[in-house]
Amino acid sequence: SLGLQPKTTQDFILKELEDWASFGVEGHFHARKPWLSYHEMFAEPVSKIVGAKPSEVVVMNQLTSNIHFMLVSFYRPAKERYKIICETKAFPSDQYALESHVKFHGLNPNDTIVEVEPRAGEHTIRHEDILFAIEKNKNALALVFMGGVNYYTGQVFDMKSITHAA
């Protein structure tokens, strides 16, 4: 899923490795691009992608770790509200994280995770099918977990409408 390596990547990584060798832990403060504040350079461009203010965005860790942090905070299954709706063929580690948290709460992923999939003969998920799944499961729904763009198909989801429906 990484695609082709950009031509400048190797030089960039080698410079970071040189700084690590030269500065050790002090690279957090004295590297050519100090590591301590590294995340700050991403706030502005990422905020535009997610429709937030730069002060509301932080880029940290790696995606799967962040998904686990998010699930610990927001997935609170109850007796009647325990289901998770997600798109089929989400990034595999996203699926593993969902299954992990469902099992942690003593639930069966087959009964808990509702995957919305394309109709027979189609390659993308119809928006109305996502909204239907939300409506159909509304009394048992604890979380809607949709990526903004499906990594496998490139399909862009209407997150505003999905969020409003949920």
Where is each model-derived feature located?
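Pyridoxal 5′-phosphate
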Residues: 1-166
